Each structure stands twice: as C-alpha cells, then as structure tokens.
Amino acid sequence: FSIVIRPRLFHYLAILISLAGGIELINLFYRSGLKHVTFFILSLLIYAAFCTGFMKFGLLPYKLILFAFLILSIFDSFSQITGQLWGRKKIMPKISPGKTLGGVVGGTIVSIVSAFLLKGLFTGSVTELIVFTLGTLLFAFTGDLLSSLYKRKYEVKDFNNLIPGHGGFLDRFDSLISGGAWAALCFNLFLK
C-alpha cells in the first residue's frame, strides 16, 4: 500500500528488502561453513545487480510500480494454481521441483490478459506493454530459479525461518527484486 499512499516510502522499503536479502545470502554462506566460495561470490554479484535495478524500481512513477507489482503477484499466484491443476512437466526438478511448464504458461497467459485489463496504469504502447510485461515475468522467474539454485547448493529449503512457513525475505521477494530490476531497466531505456 505504500506504493500508492507514499510512493517514496516504497523506495526505502526496496533498500531494506535488498539489504535483508543480502544478509540472508551471507548468513547462509557462513552457516554452510564457507563452502562454495566462487559460487557465493558470483551469486552475490548477480544479486547486487538485481538489487541495483530493484532500488531504481522504487523510484519509478507509482502507477508503473503498482502495475509491475500487480502483474508479478498475478503471475506468482496463477503459476501456482495452474501448475497444480495442469502442471505435469517439471521444468528444472533438481533446482525447483515445484515449477512446471503448465504453471509458467498458465501464469504468463493470465498475467498478459491482466496487463491489458490494467492498461490504465501503464503509459506506453501496446507493444511496450507486452515487452514490459513479458520481460518482468521472465526476470521474476529467473530470479526465483536463481534463489532456488542458491538454496539447493547450500542444501536448505528456505533462506531462514523469519516468517514461519514462508521462509525469509528472499523466499518472499526474489521475484519482486528481479522483476523490479527489469521494470526499472525497461523504463529507463524505452519508456521515459
């Protein structure tokens, strides 16, 4: 709700989420006994790149932030629902066993339809709307997979138990961080 009520507050929230996620990455690395140093450094660099974009996302016009946030929420929700209903083929079972092709396709279709319904929040052309939406979804999905890969490498289910039953900050915000990074990049390159 800070997106609409106090848009500047969302920027500070983005910084807080980014810092908390970084602490989780470092904490998990230390809990592992400092294993896989090269993998950790590469992961931290990728995370820093996503977070840089995510913090810029927090400075975008509030309607665009709201649009991206709603599209990501719809994608996450409907990927899970359609995956449970029609998901047979696992995408990367060793990295993220719950992700199915049916879930990704279903979530993407519902998100694209929703993007057209939410067009009033988006100021660009139809082509820009489609590119923005598909890019946001692709980045969000990639961020989610990278988080899963990191957890598998360090042999844990969740980054931490901060939120019982939901894991830590990165378990909740990985898609938003990476999808927000694309939204900021796309806005600054094409939509300004």
Segment roles from a protein language model:
Residues 1-139:
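Membrane-embedded alpha-helical bundles of polytopic integral membrane proteins
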Residues 85, 148-156:
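Juxtamembrane interface at the ends
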Residues 128-129, 173, 192:
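Short, conserved aromatic-histidine micro-motifs
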Residues 153-176:
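Interfacial loop-to-transmembrane junctions
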Residues 185-192:
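Juxtamembrane boundary at the C-terminal end of a transmembrane helix
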